[in-house]
Amino acid sequence: MKKDDRLKKFKYKVAAFYNFISIIDEEILLIKEELTKLATNQKIKGTILLASEGVNGTICGPENAIVQFIETLEKLLKVSDINVKYSWSEKQAFRRFKARKKKEIVTIGLKEINPTKSVGKYIKAGEWNQFLEDPNSVVIDTRNEYEIKIGNFAGALNPQTSSFREFPAWVQKHLKPLIEENPSLKIGMYCTGGIRCEKATSYLIEEGFSDVHHLEGGILKYLEDVSSENSLWNGECFVFDQRVSLDHELLPGSHRMCHACGLPISPEDLKKPTYIKGLQCDACVNKFTDSDRARFAERQRQIDEIMKRLPENSIWPSS
């Protein structure tokens, strides 16, 4: 089925955005209040994080409402170029709207890192293949292990982290020795939408690394700009909402989420004897107590009842 035909059933637009920009506390409170009011009026759901270093969020709603929301956010931030990527969803991708004030909009846990002052060099999506194939470059995936497992660029280093907080330790243990032995290597990093790899470049620059680059707009921008025929991307892209993953056309992929452990599960995982809907998957079969599983079973029973009564429910069902 062609993308245009598939899009006919996708009535919700999803916007993933971020901007590293200095914001004072009074402005944060105002922005939070205005965006919450707009989201309520326009039936927009999602999550937005606000901090002194900027804004980071993903929202879902009717297309016109999403456009208005982004325009309002840019006015509130006094910018005209917020980093935003769009994709589509058949159903509402979030359960509620939340706007929160945080210490960081993406948590690396180091106070001295300030992406509003210094970051690496952007690589456009159309130039990323050339960088990947450059023998004098090293490419690093700054996402978590469970994200990398379902999709990646072949040859990229996998730090095998379970959270972004672990990235600095990996740099000290693995990347520093590599660059000390190969000082001419160019460093390139990527992530889902650009925010983690951008902050990672700020950290590397602070640590004295040079020739540091990152994929502008992340994987999502690459999938938007680079055709599947020319793409070096393998698999699907994990996203932090009810869709779980996106295919190369930025439409919902084939993965579901295990609502016991929160990890993505593939169509093959669903067929394994260890999989029980809502209770366990192959990755967490030995991780929970009988008491935990009883709670999971009751939650799944309630979800199933809701789905029976409200078959047109816009929220994705549990897996």
Swiss-Prot record:
Listed EC numbers: 1.14.-.-
MF terms in GO: oxidoreductase activity, acting on paired donors, with incorporation or reduction of molecular oxygen
A biological process from GO: tRNA modification
Broad enzyme group: oxidoreductase
Domain Rhodanese positions: 133-231
Top-level taxon in the UniProt lineage: Bacteria
Catalytic activity: uridine(34) in tRNA + AH2 + O2 = 5-hydroxyuridine(34) in tRNA + A + H2O
SMART domains: RHOD
Keyword terms of this UniProt record: Oxidoreductase, tRNA processing
Cysteine pairings via disulfide bonds: none
Xref: Gene3D superfamilies: 3.30.70.100, Rhodanese-like domain
Annotated function: Catalyzes oxygen-dependent 5-hydroxyuridine (ho5U) modification at position 34 in tRNAs.
HAMAP family with a match to the protein in the record: TrhO
Protein name in the entry: tRNA uridine(34) hydroxylase
Organism: Prochlorococcus marinus (strain NATL2A)
